[in-house]
A protein has these predicted regions:
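Metal-dependent phosphoesterases centered on the DNase I-like endonuclease/exonuclease/phosphatase
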Residues: 3-92, 96
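Short acidic, gly/pro-rich beta-turn/loop elements at beta-sheet edges
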Residues: 35, 110, 122
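Hydrophobic/anchoring residues in structured secondary elements
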Residues: 69, 111-114
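Hydrophobic alpha-helical positions that pack around
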Residues: 100
Length: 132
């Protein structure tokens, strides 16, 4: 977790000079059970390990909001599917791609989405719209 801890430290320092941040990307971690198709069978799989989930929880608690879950509590909303076992067609996915918004921007979130129709990769693009 050295990289993740150093990343969080870097973002904390960056936030001091630039408080309005959106940190987007593939975190390779499902935060909550709602973010993975089978939390029971995957509880010991990298990407859903307790220590990984604790790290993303700490990151969010440092002043960030998961823009997608801020507005959407629907299950079965994923951004990644394995190429194996027809996972995408059966929607057996994971939500591991995030647009995390710093606290000062939280109330500006208008929409956050996953473009599940995009099929260029095993991941789908995620996006967030802010209003000012």
């Amino acid at each position: 977790f050295k990289f993740m801890d150093e990343f969080q430290e870097y973002i904390s320092e960056l936030k001091e000079d630039f408080p309005n941040l959106i940190i987007c990307g593939d975190y390779n971690i499902c935060h909550e059970t709602i973010d993975i198709h089978d939390p029971i069978r995957n509880k010991k799989v990298s990407g859903f390990l307790p220590q990984e989930r604790q790290w993303i929880e700490r990151f969010l608690n440092s002043g960030f909001t998961d823009s997608f879950r801020h507005l959407n509590s629907e299950p079965n909303q994923y951004s990644w599917w394995s190429y194996r076992a027809n996972a995408r067609n059966n929607n057996k996915g994971w939500r591991i791609d995030y647009a995390l918004v710093s606290e000062p921007l939280k109330n500006n979130i208008k929409r956050s989405y996953i473009l599940q129709e995009a099929k260029h990769s095993d991941h789908c693009p995620v996006g967030v719209e802010l209003i000012f």
